[in-house]
């Protein structure tokens, strides 16, 4: 009888031991699963701003809505155009400007017909082309810059096209330093301001002027005069003295990097020698540089909206942003 009771107690204890062992294992498994789930969820939340899993891939439709609280937006299209084309408001205007007080809402609504969701179109104005070097930040997933083309600003357009279509690393130049030199073909000096008059004197290895006198600024060679923006190229690996009106112009030493593939340039031309190969109506255009021959700004925007797919397909959304202070470190 005693043995039977002892056996019964042992069996019960074994059953309890096995149950507790299994229960503890299940408890630990459940606890571990919860901890791992919480860690993964937090990591995804922390890295959401820099991960590219939610990046758009434009194929005729933008897939996600812009987050207006995020200044570095990876799901939007920014369009930059001169603020001078926003004319006096009122019906019946024939000057060709954007005279509709609701022009921004109208343009955004028309982009919606092409698949862009509400809130994904950002219209921004600029005062002068040199603003893109000095103050304009381009941080959208796609950026389109519209620049009027005329014989009087053709040089500035070429320079700003070079600037916005490529990535640059820049540092401010201190002209109190005696000489500067450029180290390669991708090394240029960016001059920008209200009036940039820049002249240089190249020096030989003995620091004597080559075709000029370092002590006489009147003998310096003029590289830029009465311009708002200039990308200055001098002979590489040759020291130069620089003369510039620092009150109305700034100078940066810049190194050209890779192409900025999320940015395109549209030049507005009224020239009779218009090059049709640059029109967005030409499907062969792949250089991210277009021309539209028109005088009326509603015609210009209608053309951009209608051919936005052609323009977007020359671009890549995931790319560096542009900041005026120099090297573009952050990716869209």
From Swiss-Prot:
Keyword Signal tagged: yes
Entry comment on modification after translation: N-glycosylated.
Signal peptide: 1-33
Keyword Calcium among record annotations: yes
Glycosylation sites: 67, 225
Keywords for the protein's UniProt record, in alphabetical order: Calcium, Capsid protein, Disulfide bond, Glycoprotein, Host endoplasmic reticulum, Host-virus interaction, Metal-binding, Outer capsid protein, Signal, T=13 icosahedral capsid protein, Virion
GO molecular-function terms, A-Z: metal ion binding
Main localization of the protein described in the UniProt heading: virion
Recorded GO CC terms: host cell endoplasmic reticulum lumen; T=13 icosahedral viral capsid; viral outer capsid
Cellular localisation: Virion; Host endoplasmic reticulum lumen
Lineage top rank: taxon: Viruses
Family statement drawn from the similarity comment of this UniProt entry: Belongs to the rotavirus VP7 family.
UniProt function note: Calcium-binding protein that interacts with rotavirus cell receptors once the initial attachment by VP4 has been achieved. Rotavirus attachment and entry into the host cell probably involves multiple sequential contacts between the outer capsid proteins VP4 and VP7, and the cell receptors. Following entry into the host cell, low intracellular or intravesicular Ca(2+) concentration probably causes the calcium-stabilized VP7 trimers to dissociate from the virion. This step is probably necessary for the membrane-disrupting entry step and the release of VP4, which is locked onto the virion by VP7.
Assembly description: Homotrimer; disulfide-linked. 2 Ca(2+) ions bound at each subunit interface in the trimer hold the trimer together. Interacts with the intermediate capsid protein VP6. Interacts with the outer capsid protein VP5*.
The protein's name: Outer capsid glycoprotein VP7
Species the sequence originates in: Rotavirus C (strain RVC/Pig/United States/Cowden/1980) (RV-C)
């Amino acid at each position: 009888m005693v043995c039977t009771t002892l056996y019964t107690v042992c069996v019960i204890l074994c059953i309890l031991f096995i149950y507790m062992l299994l229960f503890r294992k299940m408890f630990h498994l459940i606890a571990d699963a919860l901890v791992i789930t919480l860690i993964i969820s937090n990591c995804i939340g922390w890295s959401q701003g820099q991960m590219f899993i939610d990046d758009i891939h434009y194929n005729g439709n933008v897939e996600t809505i812009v987050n207006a609280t995020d200044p570095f937006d990876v799901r939007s299209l920014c369009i930059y155009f001169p603020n001078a084309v926003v004319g006096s408001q009122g019906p019946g205007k024939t000057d060709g400007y954007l005279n509709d007080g609701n022009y921004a809402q109208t343009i955004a609504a028309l982009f919606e017909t092409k698949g862009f969701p509400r809130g994904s179109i950002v219209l921004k104005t600029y005062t002068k082309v040199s603003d893109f070097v000095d103050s304009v930040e381009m941080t959208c997933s796609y950026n389109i810059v519209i620049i009027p083309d005329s014989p009087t600003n053709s040089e500035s357009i070429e320079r700003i096209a070079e600037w916005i279509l490529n990535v640059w690393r820049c540092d401010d130049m201190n002209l109190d330093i005696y000489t500067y030199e450029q180290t390669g073909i991708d090394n240029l000096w960016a001059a920008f301001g209200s009036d940039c008059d820049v002249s240089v004197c190249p020096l030989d290895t003995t620091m004597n002027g080559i075709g000029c006198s370092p002590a006489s600024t009147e003998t310096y060679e003029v590289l830029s005069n009465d311009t708002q923006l200039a990308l200055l190229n001098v002979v590489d690996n040759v020291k130069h003295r620089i003369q510039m009106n620092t009150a109305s112009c700034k100078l940066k030493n810049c190194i050209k990097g890779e192409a900025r593939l999320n940015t395109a340039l549209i030049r507005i031309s009224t020239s009779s020698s218009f090059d049709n190969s640059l029109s967005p109506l030409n499907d062969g255009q792949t250089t991210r540089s277009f021309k539209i021959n028109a005088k009326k700004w509603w015609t210009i925007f209608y053309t951009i909206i209608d051919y936005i797919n052609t323009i977007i397909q020359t671009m890549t959304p995931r790319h560096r942003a542009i900041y005026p202070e120099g090297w573009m470190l952050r990716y869209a």
